[in-house]
């Protein structure tokens, strides 16, 4: 049965972590694909989903239903913080923190690495390209 709740806006409409956890517990798809579902998370695009999972330390492959309450809380906080900062800086990516995965995920030559030298893997998850760091995201 489809969820009839309205889509959640990351800056103003995310439910409390416990409610978000109940919503995610109904989803068997990888968390990356769930975050890109616009009927659930309006406005969360590919780079925001990758960045939130990177900052939360969560593998994009993890089934949404398997996330712990602490992990759901980390994803929720990351989504809110990323969107709040992007809005604050009028989406001027040159003003985003240099530690963000965002700055390296767009490179298409050579071995991709984070600002800390960690390898970035690029693969398709849920029909979309995902950039993630296996040594940091579990």
Give the predicted meaning of each segment.
Residues 34, 61-65, 97-100:
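Short, local alpha-helical segments
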Residues 3, 37, 50, 66, ...:
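Acidic-enriched, low-complexity/disordered segments with a strong bias for Aspartate over Glutamate
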Residues 1-55, 75, 126, 133-134:
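Phosphate/anion-contacting hairpin/loop surfaces
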Residues 25-29, 50, 54-87:
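Accessory alpha-helical DNA-binding modules that contact the DNA backbone or grooves
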Residues 83-138:
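C-terminal accessory segment of soluble enzyme catalytic cores
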